[in-house]
């Protein structure tokens, strides 16, 4: 069965069946175009970021009675609208190596068919990145080792230094990474 998880809970737990999905869309690069009188062609002004992306799942659920359907849909709404003011982890069975961070977006317009089938589209407003699950695992690196990013986009890893003694960063070294120093006495 195909499924998505949101905030640690699976759609399969509710018996939701995914009819269609839009999960592979790429985010829009945030740029604007500036026209200048007397000059052919617009200037491109980059905001140096990607906009959030919409991820949607169209789902349906069957139940034996209208009461069962109503109870289940109430539980689904409780699940999806828990903490709607923050991003939550989203995974699915279609793209199982990656996860996203998103929040429910818009309303749930639930259409009932034959009074026992509920159909609706769940839309999440997601950060523009997908995170490779194994890339979120902690990795130990020793002196002289290298870190390699296999993805096409740049990443900013969280680097934690542990050990004893003085920590010196060469004056010529520059970094855009978050470095947390944890040196024991």
Label for each model-derived stretch:
Residues 79-87:
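Short helix C-cap/helix-to-loop transition motifs enriched in small/turn-promoting residues
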Residues 132-185:
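Intrinsically disordered, low-complexity segments enriched in serine, threonine, and glycine
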Residues 71-80:
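Short amphipathic alpha-helices in soluble, non-transmembrane regions
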Residues 86-130:
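Short beta-strand and beta-hairpin "edge-sheet" elements
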Residues 1-7, 88-90, 168-172:
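Short polybasic amphipathic segments
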Residues 42-67, 116-129:
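Oligomerization/assembly interface segments of phage tail-like spikes and tubes
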Residues 45-46, 111-112, 145-147:
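Beta-strand-rich interaction surfaces with strong enrichment in secreted/lumenal proteins
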Residues 1-54, 97-109:
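Solvent-exposed edge beta-strands and adjacent loop segments
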């Amino acid at each position: 069965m195909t499924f998505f998880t949101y905030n640690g809970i699976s759609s399969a737990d509710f018996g939701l069946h995914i009819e269609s999905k839009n999960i592979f869309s790429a985010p829009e690069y945030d740029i604007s175009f500036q026209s200048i009188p007397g000059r052919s062609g617009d200037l491109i002004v980059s905001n140096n970021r990607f906009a959030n992306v919409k991820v949607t799942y169209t789902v349906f659920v069957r139940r034996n009675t209208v009461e069962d359907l109503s109870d289940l849909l109430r539980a689904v709404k409780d699940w999806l609208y828990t903490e709607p003011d923050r991003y939550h982890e989203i995974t699915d069975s279609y793209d199982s190596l990656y996860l996203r961070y998103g929040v429910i977006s818009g309303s749930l317009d639930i259409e009932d068919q034959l009074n026992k089938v509920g159909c609706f589209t769940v839309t999440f407003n997601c950060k523009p990145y997908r995170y490779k699950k194994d890339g979120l695992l902690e990795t130990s690196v020793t002196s002289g080792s290298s870190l390699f990013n296999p993805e096409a986009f740049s990443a900013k890893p969280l680097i934690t230094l542990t050990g004893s003694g003085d920590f010196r960063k060469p004056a010529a070294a520059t970094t855009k990474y978050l470095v947390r120093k944890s040196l024991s006495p």
